[in-house]
Amino acid sequence: MARTGALLLVALALAGCAQACIYKFGTSPDSKATVSGDHWDHGLNGENWEGKDGAGNAWVCKTGRKQSPINVPQYQVLDGKGSKIANGLQTQWSYPDLMSNGTSVQVINNGHTIQVQWTYNYAGHATIAIPAMHNQTNRIVDVLEMRPNDAADRVTAVPTQFHFHSTSEHLLAGKIYPLELHIVHQVTEKLEACKGGCFSVTGILFQLDNGPDNELLEPIFANMPSREGTFSNLPAGTTIKLGELLPSDRDYVTYEGSLTTPPCSEGLLWHVMTQPQRISFGQWNRYRLAVGLKECNSTETAADAGHHHHHRRLLHNHAHLEEVPAATSEPKHYFRRVMLAESANPDAYTCKAVAFGQNFRNPQYANGRTIKLARYH
């Protein structure tokens, strides 16, 4: 009898979902987001990420040995080991303001994060040290093994987009922060291994503050779309002061890691800033609603069901993260036009946020990796 009752409850729940149901971020039926490869979401914070990308290549989220994020050790631990990046080998950042002309800067809800991209040749960049004498075996992460007096060259890393995670993905000495910003950079010069594109990511942590909203975040948060697979153009004249989003104290921890979302490709050079920026309680709540749980109701009649309309929405040329090529990989076209996939009548649903959400991956084992501290001067 108990089993029969349980089955009846399940059947009633499924029947109820035909009219209204709660969907976690990344699964909303009104989504117009692209689908490439196996579906994934942050429901279990990456613990169930086993699948393949759109080309049929297996993700390495569960098998990789240099995965991100990690729990960053305390300063004293790194100082005690002498694990430091020499001043002359430290990464340098230069980010002028991002300026929208009304269509050149977008805030995108892609069903996995809130992301900012641009369609013009932004002059921002970072420069990363590499060995002065480099060959086809050298990689973007070689700075981790360079000694203070080693002769160095530099490569330019061009930012292609930035996005957010809540709560933070990296931990500092076990501490979790409410928000983390990732600025994704691409390197295509000098190193043979980077001809198809190498990636470096700069992570900025945010801590809650009792004061007013952080004005640096407001142009983004004021334009966050709530619907997955859609974007908002920043109004003409709106600026994002990306350089000021970097902490004034630019001490950072650096290590070799991976993408924090499928396919979790490895070989990335990570920089995690150790001084957090600030975010207000209201801004944090707004972000968590944008990636929150949705209650969706179907407005489609039985007659409509056989006449699903297909919707396609064009985004723009942008750097699309697929996988980090190995030194022997063929060059890939990372800049391409992305068309949001056809969906079975997503407009047949009305959805509203009903609970706060999250979009972070759990920390991964360091597995003996080299982790170094840069004391910025």
From Swiss-Prot:
Residues in Alpha-carbonic anhydrase domain copies: 38-318
SMART domains noted in UniProt: Carb_anhydrase
Short name of one Pfam family: Carb_anhydrase
Keyword Zinc: yes
Record's note on what induces expression: Requires light in addition to a decrease in CO(2) concentration during growth.
Molecular function GO labels: carbonate dehydratase activity; zinc ion binding
Cysteine pairs bridged by disulfides in the record: C61-C264, C194-C198, C296-C351
Catalytic-site annotation from UniProt: H112
UniProt xrefs under CDD domains: alpha_CA_prokaryotic_like
Task of the protein: Reversible hydration of carbon dioxide.
Name of the protein: Carbonic anhydrase 1
Gene: CAH1
